[in-house]
Amino acid sequence: MAAASRSASGWALLLLVALWQQRAAGSGVFQLQLQEFINERGVLASGRPCEPGCRTFFRVCLKHFQAVVSPGPCTFGTVSTPVLGTNSFAVRDDSSGGGRNPLQLPFNFTWPGTFSLIIEAWHAPGDDLRPEALPPDALISKIAIQGSLAVGQNWLLDEQTSTLTRLRYSYRVICSDNYYGDNCSRLCKKRNDHFGHYVCQPDGNLSCLPGWTGEYCQQPICLSGCHEQNGYCSKPAECLCRPGWQGRLCNECIPHNGCRHGTCSTPWQCTCDEGWGGLFCDQDLNYCTHHSPCKNGATCSNSGQRSYTCTCRPGYTGVDCELELSECDSNPCRNGGSCKDQEDGYHCLCPPGYYGLHCEHSTLSCADSPCFNGGSCRERNQGANYACECPPNFTGSNCEKKVDRCTSNPCANGGQCLNRGPSRMCRCRPGFTGTYCELHVSDCARNPCAHGGTCHDLENGLMCTCPAGFSGRRCEVRTSIDACASSPCFNRATCYTDLSTDTFVCNCPYGFVGSRCEFPVGLPPSFPWVAVSLGVGLAVLLVLLGMVAVAVRQLRLRRPDDGSREAMNNLSDFQKDNLIPAAQLKNTNQKKELEVDCGLDKSNCGKQQNHTLDYNLAPGPLGRGTMPGKFPHSDKSLGEKAPLRLHSEKPECRISAICSPRDSMYQSVCLISEERNECVIATEV
C-alpha cells in the first residue's frame, strides 16, 4: 500500500515538473539576428582607443513599450553574447565561442504586439564578462528602439548608426512549439489516441485525421453507406450492426429465428415468399420447391402457375442466377488502383502515393509535383499534406480540371457565351443588350420611321408602315399618288391630280360649281319627263289589266241557255199560292225578268197590288233565264232580260224558299223577310 502511495506521489511530481517546464518555456520567442558591426577606429564610446583592439560582445534588453526607453528592468528578458569579434566584423548565423545567432528571448505570456529593445556593445578586456566585472568606460555603443511587431516568420531588417559605430541586424517574433495564433496564446498539440485524432492548423484550429470527425476529432467516420440508425462504428471505415440488423451496411433486418423462406421489414419478422407457407415459411407450395430452378443459392419466388423469379445472391445474375458477377466490374478503385475480387467482396491495390479502401487518399507531397497546369504547390501541416494554388481557368485538388465559365449558360435570350480567360462575356442577338443579354432593346424607341410612318418592332428588326404618298424602308421616299382614284368629282366632272400637292382638282360641266362640282347653278327648270313617263306607263298597264278581266268575264258568260233549271213552276200550287205576296218584290238579278202567273183565279191579278221590282240590290248579272212573259205591274221595264215566271193561285204571294237553276252560273234566291206581306227575290253568285 505504501509502495503504491509512493508511486502515485512520484507520478504527480513528474506531472508538476512537466507543467512547470511547459510554462517556463513560454508561448513564444523574440529572435534577434546580429549581422554586422562596424568600429573602424577601434575606440570606446568615450573616444579612447582599445588596446590592442576592441574585443566586442553584446548585451540585449527586451522590455515593454516605452515612448522614451529607460534603462530600467528588462521586463521581457535579457541575453548576452560571448566576444564575437574585434573592432569591425560580420556575425555568422551561429558564432564561435558557444554563442547563438540569432539570439533567443523567450516569453511565457501573450505577445502584446509592441516592444522596446536596447542593444549595448561592450569591450571585454578579460574573460570575465559579468557587468560588475567590467569598468563603466568599457561601453562601445548603445542603441534603443521601440515599435510594433506582429507574430510571423518574416525578418525585419534594421541598421543603427552612431558617430563612431554602425550595427546592422534583423529581428522577429515566432510562437513556440504547440502555440498558435496572432499572439501565440493558442495551445494545440497533435494527438492520435482515445482523446482525439487530429493535427494543428497554422491558426491553432484542429484538423481531424482522415476517418475522424467531431469537435475534438473523437467520432469515427463509419463505412460509406452504413445505415445511420441501424449501424455504428468504433473506428473509421467500419460498420457494426445493432441488434436485429445485418449486412455490410446494416440495412438488412434479421428475420425470426428459424424463418427459412421469408423476409422481414423490421427485425424478427417472417413474411413468406410466394410459394412458401407455414409459421417459418418452410412449407413448399409450388414450382420453386418442386423444381429448384434457381442456382448458386438464389431465392426462388413463385410468380404464378409454373412461373418463378430468382433473387440472386450478391455476385450473381441471370434468369436462374447462373452467371457470376465480379464486384470489380464497377471499377471501385480510384487513382489507378487495381481491383482484386474476393469471396466476400473486393480489395483495391493502390499505386504509390495513395491509400484507403478505394485508394481515395493521397500521400503525395510538394516534392512529387502533384499540381498540374502550372499550379503552385504549398505544403500544409509540416509537410503532412499539400494544397495546390491553381492558375486562372483551372480548378480541382490538383488543378486538373479546366474551368468552363459558360457551363451555367448565363446568357439569356439566346445570347452566345464566350470564355475570355478569367472572365466571360455574352454576345447578344439583335434586339437585346446588357451584361447577360437580359435587356430587350426596342428598335422603335428612336422613331426611325419618317413622315409620320408607324413603326412595328420585330424580333430581328423593325418595319415601317408608310402614310399615303411615301415609301421606302423608313418612309423616306416621296411618291405621287392618284388622288382621283376614289372618284371624288360629282355630276360627270373631269378629275385631275395635282402632282405638287397630291390633291385632286375637279373640272365641272356647264351648270355645276363647287370643289367637287356638287352644287347646280340657277337654270330654268326642265320638264319632268321621267315622272310623266312613269305615270302614263302605269295607267296603260291598269287599262290592259281591266280589259283582260272583262274578256275573261265575257268568256264565262257565254255558256248555253238551254240547260235544265229548277224553276218556280216546279213548285206545288200551295207553294205557288204563298210564294209571292202582295208586297214589294225585289229582283237582284238584272238579267232575269219577273212574271207572276196567278193561275185560274185572275181576280187578284187585276188588283193593284204594286208588285214592284227593285233592282237596286243587284250588283250585276247572276244568271240566265228563258221563262217568257212580263210582270204586269212593274215600275221598271225589264227590257230584254230573260223572264222568270212566278205562278200563284191566290191573291197573296208568299215566298219561303230559294228558287234558282242549279246548273247555271247564277242562282236566283228568294229572300223572305220577317213580315209576311213583303217578298224579296234576289240573286246570289
Curated annotation (Swiss-Prot):
Matching InterPro entries: DSL, EGF-like_Ca-bd_dom, EGF-like_dom, EGF-type_Asp/Asn_hydroxyl_site, Growth_fac_rcpt_cys_sf, Notch_Cell-Fate_Det, Notch_ligand_N
Subcellular location field: Cell membrane
Paired cysteines (S-S): 50-54, 61-74, 175-184, 188-200, 208-217, 222-233, 226-239, 241-250, 253-264, 259-270, 272-281, 288-300, 294-310, 312-321, 328-339, 333-348, 350-359, 366-377, 371-388, 390-399, 406-417, 411-426, 428-437, 444-455, 449-464, 466-475, 484-495, 489-506, 508-517
Protein's UniProt keywords contain Coiled coil: no
Disease annotated for this entry: Adams-Oliver syndrome 6: A form of Adams-Oliver syndrome, a disorder characterized by the congenital absence of skin (aplasia cutis congenita) in combination with transverse limb defects. Aplasia cutis congenita can be located anywhere on the body, but in the vast majority of the cases, it is present on the posterior parietal region where it is often associated with an underlying defect of the parietal bones. Limb abnormalities are typically limb truncation defects affecting the distal phalanges or entire digits (true ectrodactyly).
Domain DSL span(s) in chain numbering: 173-217
UniProt cross-references to CDD domains, sorted A to Z: EGF_CA
GO molecular function, one term: receptor ligand activity
Known role: Involved in the Notch signaling pathway as Notch ligand. Activates NOTCH1 and NOTCH4. Involved in angiogenesis; negatively regulates endothelial cell proliferation and migration and angiogenic sprouting. Essential for retinal progenitor proliferation. Required for suppressing rod fates in late retinal progenitors as well as for proper generation of other retinal cell types. During spinal cord neurogenesis, inhibits V2a interneuron fate.
Name the UniProt record assigns to this protein: Delta-like protein 4
Keywords assigned by UniProt, alphabetized: Angiogenesis, Cell membrane, Developmental protein, Differentiation, Disease variant, Disulfide bond, EGF-like domain, Glycoprotein, Membrane, Neurogenesis, Notch signaling pathway, Repeat, Sensory transduction, Signal, Transmembrane, Transmembrane helix, Vision
Lineage summary: Eukaryota, Metazoa, Chordata, Craniata, Vertebrata
Signal peptide positions on this chain: 1-26
Note on domains (UniProt): The Delta-Serrate-Lag2 (DSL) domain is required for binding to the Notch receptor.
Gene expressing this chain: DLL4
Organ and tissue specificity: Expressed in vascular endothelium.
Repeat found in the keyword field: yes
Sugar-modified residues: 108, 183, 205, 393
Membrane topology: Single-pass type I membrane protein
Complex and partners: Interacts with NOTCH4. Interacts (via N-terminal DSL and MNNL domains) with NOTCH1 (via EGF-like domains).
Regions of this protein lying in the Extracellular compartment: 27-529
GO annotations of cellular component type: plasma membrane
Stretches of the chain found on the membrane's Cytoplasmic side: 551-685
Record GO biological process: angiogenesis; aortic valve morphogenesis; blood vessel lumenization; blood vessel remodeling; branching involved in blood vessel morphogenesis; cardiac atrium morphogenesis; cardiac ventricle morphogenesis; cellular response to fibroblast growth factor stimulus
Domain EGF-like span(s) in chain numbering: 218-251, 252-282, 284-322, 324-360, 362-400, 402-438, 440-476, 480-518
Region (Interaction with Notch1): 185-187, 191-195
Transmembrane segments: 530-550
Site positions (Interaction with Notch1): 110, 216
